Amino acid sequence: MLLTLYLSYFLSKTKIYYEKGIYKIEGSISVLSKKYLVISNENNNILIYTSDLKNSTPLSLGDQVEIQGELNPIEIDNSKIATFYLQNNINYLLKKTVILTVIKPEFSVKEKIMNYSKNHGELFDSYWRLLVFGSYDSKELVLNKVNRLNIVHLIVISGLHFDLLFYLILLILKPLDKIKIKSKYVAFALIFYYLTLLANPVSALRAYIMQVVKNSNNPFSYNNKFKKYDGLLISILVLFLLKNNYLFSLSFILSFSSTFTIMLLVPMVKSKKLNNFLKTLILMTLIYLFNIPMLLYINEYWNYFGLLLGIIMAPLFQFFHLCSLLFWWSPTMLSWMYYLLDNLLYYLVEYTFALKINISINWWILIFWSSFWYLTIFFMKLKSNIKIWKIKTA
């Protein structure tokens, strides 16, 4: 993983470079929000703040544009800005920007989804698009609430969402097996198409690849099975090959580090003589503690009830995610559900205490914290193995 991170950083520097000045640039819109957009041009991504943009034509993802403005090399003020630039592969900031021409695609599924969502009110649009596709226009309605509750990682599309979705689709398609059509292949095809519609597919793609590996045969193994960590390693390699800058995204780091830690901890927790509920509770607590620095890096708030809220809200968000997918054709019902969820989040924010953290969390703190956990787990496993070896040789 360290090698792929280094290669990603190296490749991000092998670009076509421009000197500071006024340029006309052609490219496509790869990222779009209310505050900024990103233009892809000759393997360079160019950031434009919408407050600095002169344009009368509504813009959409995928639009081909010709723009003119003052091109400036990026300036990095802090680690969060650096992370944003790296994960989006941004090399330049364009100021005093004028859009000269806009060419829209003849048909866009994402545009149809956007219009459908916006046509059913602000509440539906804010929750439905966020829960189903991980996209949003404003943080005000939803994300600010979950940030203060330390549960923002639960509402966005994650690997767990995809695992549940895969098994649900597999259950629905099970009758296909009777007519000699492999239901799992149809399920993988449907989920792959869904993947292409996500605003940030990193975590979901990780889960998808791991499921594919889990349900495939390994031609290089004597028993045709992949080893425990093969799926995780293959997913890292695939993401690197698809887009090397994925490896700098917070989604990648949070998803892969959490998954790897869970895979290390599960055998240790399972070995304890406890019931399944307590084992699950212990595992969730350990993962929450492991992710504390990353959550503070993302949220800037510390909620004293964050662990309890995470345990309670995780299954609730899973339920809302599946309902949003299955009942997309009933915006009235979903709007009513979102109204209840929004009120629940409002009261949780009002009656739980969140402290704003002024400590600057940088990548060295995250690396040190992760290393401490992994070394601790390694020595605990080593101690356990030595104990087992002594018993066997006694």
Regions found by a protein language model. Name each.
Residues 144-307, 365-394:
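Hydrophobic alpha-helical transmembrane segments in multi-pass membrane proteins
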Residues 69, 131, 158, 199, ...:
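Divalent metal-coordination and catalytic microenvironments
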Residues 2-5, 263, 292-293, 319-323, ...:
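Alpha-helical transmembrane segments
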Residues 98, 321-328, 377-382:
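Cytosol/matrix-facing ends of alpha-helical transmembrane segments
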